[in-house]
A protein has these predicted regions:
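Histidine-/acidic-rich catalytic cores in large beta-rich domains
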Residues: 16-342
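Bacterial N-terminal signal peptides
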Residues: 1-12
């Protein structure tokens, strides 16, 4: 724990150090600004790619569907935190992994170093629970400026803030209880800390995005036409960017609820019928980075809806060069536009 704190507090900026050959696939640099960190869900790995060459420069996860010290099962989220990488080991649902047709658990949130060593984790490998140091399908984790970690513990119907000493210091949602009323959630899929101290939650099965304060009151909500709220982030202009997964679209809505921008991932050439995008992140250049899950791609689109970058081959799952398998999350290293900065 002390090592983690030393590493994080001594990191003045994102490093651009060479990655060790035992971890890097092709050598080169690690955590370079502009690289893309991808949670390659059903390939059971987190990868960092150079967007200019499409080459993988760093990876965590050996492809195993069993949670272990060098593996991660169906990761749904990853974030660069100084010299470390925060990873949500979500676990695969039934039918997601051929090697475990009934589903395979991971249930860990981990801080991993460049060598692929786990320096900190909350949750126990393959153990599903709601007690101390236990999780149930953690789909997202956000490292907070105070060094706590905000975890969207989906199967336990809660968002929890935990310290690096594994103490829960705040919770929204009642453990194991679904609902849409006061302090309840239904399959939450993401949570972001806002500048005002409130928490923005994508409450997936309630088909809504809510902003809640620390006293558990909803102070803002958007639910108009939403089906499967997968992710939400608050932009600097006060708008909210929402991944409306089951409607296969990304929308930007004003504080008053007006849709000011929209992009449909199912309308592009080669798309499957229901790609169910899972993450949309606004970038500093004004474009939007989208994890277009079942189209097997991460794409960057501009305000006009033109694709200016893609990683992966549309509708083709694989582990080879420039291939992905149901990518769930992607972020540009060093770009926290609209996201909680660590």
């Amino acid at each position: 724990m002390v090592l983690v704190l030393v590493l994080l507090t001594s990191s003045k900026a994102f490093p651009q150090a060479a990655a060790p050959a035992t971890v890097s696939v092709v050598g080169g640099a690690y955590h370079v600004r502009g690289d893309i960190l991808i949670s390659d869900q059903f390939n059971n790995r987190v990868i960092e790619v150079n967007p200019r060459t499409h080459q993988i420069v760093w990876t965590f996860g050996d492809g195993s569907s069993t949670a272990g010290p060098k593996s991660v099962v169906a990761p749904n989220d990853a974030q660069v935190v100084g010299p470390l990488t925060l990873i949500a080991g979500t676990g695969a649902p039934p039918g997601g992994e051929p090697s475990c047709p009934n589903g395979c658990a991971d249930n860990r949130v981990m801080l991993v170093d460049v060598f692929g060593d786990i320096l900190w984790q909350y949750g126990q490998a393959g153990v599903t629970g709601s007690g101390r140091n236990q999780l149930n399908t953690p789909v997202q984790a956000t490292f907070l400026p105070n060094f706590d970690v905000l975890i969207t513990d989906q199967g336990n119907q809660r968002v929890i803030e935990v310290t690096l000493w594994n103490d829960i210091v705040w919770q929204y949602g009642q453990t194991g209880m679904t609902g849409s009323g006061y302090n309840t959630l239904n399959n939450p899929n993401s949570a972001e800390l806002l500048d005002n101290g409130n928490i923005l939650i994508a409450d997936e099965n309630n088909n809504r995005v809510i902003e809640v304060n620390r006293e558990h009151h909803i102070v803002w909500e958007y639910s108009n036409g939403i089906s499967g709220a997968a992710f939400a982030s608050r932009l600097k202009n006060g708008h909210t960017l929402i991944t409306d997964s089951l409607n296969n679209r990304i929308i930007e809505v004003s504080k008053g609820g007006a849709i000011v921008w929209e992009y449909s991932t199912s309308s592009r050439p080669g798309s499957v019928t229901n790609p169910n995008p899972t993450r949309a992140v606004r970038l500093a250049n004004g474009n939007t980075l989208i994890s277009d899950q079942f189209n097997m791609q991460v794409i960057e689109v501009d305000r006009k809806g033109m694709i200016v970058f893609s990683q992966g081959q549309i509708s083709v799952a694989g582990t080879g060069f420039n291939q992905l398998n149901a990518p769930y999350d992607a972020k540009v290293v060093g770009d926290f536009t609209g996201l909680t900065p660590p």
